[in-house]
Design a protein with these regions (language model features):
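PLP-dependent amino-acid enzyme catalytic core
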Residues: 1-142
Length: 142
């Protein structure tokens, strides 16, 4: 069963995950959110030794269920690679008795690298799924 995403402004405005990725915003100006949230069963004993990429596959496969496992693997493997200055991608570091998730190891040293590293792979994969051949441009600013 394919997970359906609806606009925050009109629950009748629904799309698949790949359509939401391509559209960005709903035609009514709303954001797309899942109609229902999938249950993601995560075994913490397994997760503690898993790579960032492995955890990403587990979580994203539940929310992007119209992507094949091969498509997700392609997106994740290419997005979270040596562009980051640590193999952990987003290490959890203990400092003064508190744990901090470091989201600054990407090319721009900003948390946005976490999302913007995978976005072009999601968009080009979604475009192929829908037979679109237009050039995709992603413009960002800090």
């Amino acid at each position: 069963m394919t997970l359906v995403y609806q606009s925050t402004r009109d629950a009748q405005n629904t799309v698949t995950a790949s359509q939401a990725i391509l559209q960005g915003l709903a035609t009514d100006g709303g954001l797309f959110t899942p109609v229902s949230y999938p249950q993601v069963d995560l075994d913490f004993d397994t997760l503690k030794d898993a790579s960032y990429q492995e955890v990403a596959k587990l979580v994203l496969s539940a929310f992007l269920d119209d992507f094949t496992p091969e498509e997700l693997d392609y997106c994740i493997t290419n997005a979270y690679d040596s562009k980051f200055d640590t193999p952990a991608i987003a290490p959890l570091v203990k400092l003064d008795g508190q744990y901090n998730l470091e989201l600054f190891h990407g090319s721009t040293i900003a948390f946005k690298d976490m999302a913007l590293s995978i976005l072009p792979y999601f968009m080009t994969t979604a475009a192929k799924k829908h037979g679109l051949e237009n050039k995709i441009v992603i413009l960002t600013a800090t």
